[in-house]
């Protein structure tokens, strides 16, 4: 029998990164082909409170999972991103928006080193609309992104044929265009 429990739904600013993040990384996968467009360097942060049934990375929900984020790891990520065939950085988890201290440090360095030559993608259980009501650190992180895949994974809407998404409620959002227009703009390369 399929599980009918739903993910947790926080009130605006109920979950603050400063109250939860231990600055742990669940995994780092350089030269990845599945976490966004092109070749990516994917950073999986530790800790998520959404607790989505059917989560593909349940171990990373634990804020203690993995290892502490270090300067050595950051330097390795930057070195890997410097390869000409790497298109960009991807933040996943866990929940990147509950790990803003680590994620902001990294995305700021990526922009300093590469400008917009490398794109930045992030997955989040938060929807765009929820992030618009969130704390300043979450909004700051959002402003560094090029693409946001938003929304909690919903087992009842699971669809493995979707491009870069696990369930049909999730959207692939063009962040700069959405911020400029004040409304959600779907990524123009969306196939399905």
Regions found by a protein language model. Give the residues of each.
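P-loop/Walker A phosphate-binding loop and immediately adjacent motor/lid segment at beta-alpha junctions
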Residues: 99-111, 158-192
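Conserved, mostly hydrophobic/aromatic
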Residues: 43, 95, 148
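Non-cysteine beta-strand/loop elements that form the S-adenosyl-L-methionine
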Residues: 145-154
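The −1 position to Zn-ligating cysteines in a subset of zinc-ribbon hairpins
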Residues: 44-47, 51-54
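N-terminal [4Fe-4S]-dependent radical SAM core
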Residues: 1-44, 57-62, 184, 189
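Conserved Radical SAM active-site core
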Residues: 15-16, 22-26, 39, 54-122, ...
């Amino acid at each position: 029998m399929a599980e009918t429990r739903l993910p947790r739904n926080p009130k605006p600013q109920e979950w603050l990164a400063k109250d939860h993040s231990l600055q742990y990384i669940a995994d780092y996968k350089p030269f990845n082909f599945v976490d966004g467009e092109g070749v990516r360097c994917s950073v999986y942060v530790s800790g998520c409170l959404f607790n989505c049934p059917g989560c593909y990375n349940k171990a990373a929900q634990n804020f203690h999972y993995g290892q502490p984020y270090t300067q050595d790891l950051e330097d390795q990520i930057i070195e890997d991103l410097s390869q000409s065939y790497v298109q960009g950085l991807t933040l996943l988890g866990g929940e990147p928006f509950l790990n803003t201290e680590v994620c902001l440090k990294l995305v700021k360095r990526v922009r300093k080193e590469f400008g917009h030559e490398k794109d930045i993608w992030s997955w989040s259980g938060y929807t765009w609309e929820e992030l618009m009501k969130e704390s300043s650190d979450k909004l700051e992180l959002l402003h560094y992104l090029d693409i946001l895949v938003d929304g909690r994974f919903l087992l009842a809407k699971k669809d493995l044929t979707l491009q870069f998404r696990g369930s049909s409620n999730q959207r692939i959002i063009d962040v700069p265009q959405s911020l400029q227009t004040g409304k959600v703009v779907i990524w123009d390369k969306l196939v399905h």
